Amino acid sequence: MIIMKIALNGFRNYEFETVEFAPGTNVISGQNAQGKTNLLEAVYMLSCGRSFRTRFDRELVGFGYSGADILADVYSHEREQTINIQLRPGQGKKILVNGVKKTAGELADTVNTVLFCPDDLNLIKDGAAVRRRLLDNAISQIRPRYAEYLSEFNRLYEHKTRILKDWRDKPSLLETLDEFSDGMCRASAQLIRYRAAFSARLDQAAAPIHKDFSNSLEELEIKYKTVSTVKDPFASAREIYYDICEHQEKHRQAELESAQCLTGAHKDDLEIFINGTAARSFASQGQTRTAALSIKLAEREIFLAETGEYPVLLLDDVLSELDTKRQEFVLNRIGGGQTLISCCEDEGISKRTGGRVLFISEGTIK
């Protein structure tokens, strides 16, 4: 799949700008705070309808504008298609694909993206929330139902959290606590099945990439960790649901005392091992960066296997954070699909990839 052209109107620092991309590598250069990440953010939104930097659409609208528009011509599934995302703070968001109204979750049927930014280099060392976000973002693009379950789970989690925090002042809130707990158990069961399956594929895809990078000196292993009472995360949703309910029953009193949700998929994590040792605790910075690179490149391969097309790869100022060896490893692995690379200076990337160079200054693309 290819983003052929994108037009931005009132989006971030872009007043009105149109840019055409090459089908292969595109190097987007410019000094800091000129709009490089904003452009990648707009492309990312074509796959999911949301930003990777903020939860609030109003922050995407440029100063002095009442709304923002993203209009793109894309080539996917062997045909040209158009995507139009209209952001109107206070009025909601409107998404059109080929002129037909769609939900944000349906965008993934047209465009898929894999984003790699500097924060992802800390994927191994950071907290579990970062790794859950990786799972959520990836699975939502290839399994639309997952996004629905995730949205439902988050809604229930927020309601239950408020009950646990306020029940002492309003004891009547406890009348609905079990209902929300049961709903969370049901939604968790679905999320766990999807996450377990994707984690297994990620393990299989990332291991050979990491082995190749380390000259066969390191073995990467990814294990999915979920609610302790879940005996088999690959079992049916019903079986997993009963296992989670067991955990919920054991921790109900502890939840009331701590005012926290202790049971559910919000505690999930990916455990990363290098040569059998926990990478988060014992791996060097170089090892964890290699593992993070391997995982992100594996995500790209999974999308290819799932859809028959490479997703659009977005490298947001990440190559500057890597040494020459790791830069070369990434650049040698990104053939076959479209890639957008942002950087402060070209630094020979375009020559090494044969890519097109775009220069951004104060929201103007040249």
What are these regions (language model features)?
Residues 316-318:
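Walker B catalytic acidic pair
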Residues 79, 88-90, 325-366:
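C-terminal lobe/lid and adjacent interdomain/linker elements of RecA-like ASCE P-loop ATPase modules
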Residues 122-123, 129-178, 182-185:
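Long, charged N-terminal accessory/stalk domains
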Residues 112, 269, 309-311, 335-340, ...:
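Loop/turn-to-beta-strand initiation segments
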Residues 35-36:
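Conserved lysine of the Walker
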